[in-house]
Amino acid sequence: MAQYHYQALDAQGKKCRGTQEADSARQARQLLRERGLVPLSVDENRGDQQKSGSTGLSLRRKIRLSTSDLALLTRQLATLVAASMPLEEALDAVAKQSEKPHLSQLMAAVRSKVMEGHSLADAMKCFPGSFERLYCAMVAAGETSGHLDAVLNRLADYTEQRQQMRSRIQQAMIYPCVLTVVAIAVVSILLSVVVPKVVEQFIHMKQALPLSTRVLMGMSDAVRTFGPWMLLALLAGFMAFRVMLRQEKRRVSFHRRLLHLPLIGRIARGLNTARYARTLSILNASAVPLLQAMRISGDVMSNDYARHRLSLATDAVREGVSLHKALEQTALFPPMMRHMIASGERSGELDSMLERAADNQDREFSSQMTLALGLFEPLLVVSMAAVVLFIVLAILQPILQLNTLMSS
C-alpha cells in the first residue's frame, strides 16, 4: 500500500492538502470522494514507498493484536454490521474509532482489501499476524451463512473469555512468583553478606564450631565463590532447554511427559481440553464443517503432544468414527466430557453440549489451579522459614557454647 499526496476541495469549497494511503491512485481518489472531498490532484509519494512497504510487511507479519484489542474491534464491527451498515463503512468507522495508530492502520488495510473485491475473511487472511485461522474460518462461515453479525458477537465472546482466563492465570501467579524471588534474595543475602561477617568472629576465637555452623560456613563459601558460575550454568541450561524444545520430536516428548505429571499434568490437560471443546463448539455453531473445525481447534492447543493426538482423532472422524469415540482414543478427555459430547451427538445439540463441557472443564481447571497454589504457597513459606531457622541456629550455637564456657 502506497501513500499519495493530494490536493482537494472540501464541502465548503476550500482547498486542502494531505496524504491518503491506497493501493492505486484510482483507489486514492475514490477514498477521497467517500470522505466528501473533490480531488484536484493525486500524486504518489515515491520517497515513502519503501517505508510503506515495510509498514505493510509489519502489518502482515509483526503486529500481534492482544485479545482485548481483538475483542473490542470484533464487538464494534459486530454492532455496526448488525445495524445494517455496509461492511466498508463499518470497517472505516472502526478504523477511525480506534485510538491506537497500528489498529487503525490495520483496519484501514482490511477495508482496502474488501473494497478491491475480497471477502472479509480473505482480507483478514492477508494479515495472519493479526487474525488467526480460527478467526478467519468463523468470519468465512458467517459470510457464507449470512449471519456475520452473530458470528462476530460469538467471536468477541470467545476472545473475551480467553482474555479473562489468561488474566486469571497471571493474577494467580503473581504472589507465588514474588514470594519465590523474595525468598531466594533473602537467603542469598544472608549467605553471602551476613553469615561471613558473623562467622568470622568465631574463627578469630579459634573455637571448635558445631556441625551446623561448619555446614553454614561451607554453604556461604560456595555461594560467594561459585554463585556467579551457578547463575551462568542455570542460564546456559535454560538456553539449552529452549534450543532443545525447538526440535519437534523432543518438544512432543517433553509435552507428553508434562501431561503425566501428578498435578501440573492435570492442570495442563484441563486447560487444553477446555480450550479445544470451546473452540470446537464455536466453530460448529458457526456452521464450519466438523473436520475443518477439528483441525482448527487442534491448532489452538498449547501442548504439542495433545495437538498430535487430536490430529489422529481428526483422521479417525474422517474415516467414519464418531467424535466422542475419536476423542476417547486420545486419552486426553475426562469421562464426563466424553459422555456429554456423545449425548450432544445423539441429540443433535453438539455445539451446546461442547460449550457446557468446556464450562465444566474451566471450573475444574480453576479448582485445580487454586489447589496447586494453595499447596505451593505454604510449602514455600515453610521452606523459607526452615532455611532461616537453620541459619539462625547455626549462628546461635557457637554463641551459646561460648557463654557456657565463660560461665563455667
From Swiss-Prot:
Location of the region described as Disordered in the Swiss-Prot/TrEMBL record: 38-58
GO MF annotation terms: metal ion binding
Pfam families on file: T2SSF
Transmembrane segments: 174-194, 225-245, 380-400
Any GO BP annotation: protein secretion by the type II secretion system
Ligand binding (Ca(2+)): E99, N153, D157
InterPro entries: GspF/PilC, T2SS_GspF, T2SS_GspF/T4SS_PilC_CS, T2SS_GspF_dom, T2SS_GspF_sf
Signal peptide as annotated in the record: none
Protein family (similarity comment): Belongs to the GSP F family.
UniProt function note: Component of the type II secretion system inner membrane complex required for the energy-dependent secretion of extracellular factors such as proteases and toxins from the periplasm.
Name the record gives this protein: Type II secretion system protein F
Lineage of origin: Bacteria, Pseudomonadati, Pseudomonadota, Gammaproteobacteria, Enterobacterales
Annotated gene: outF
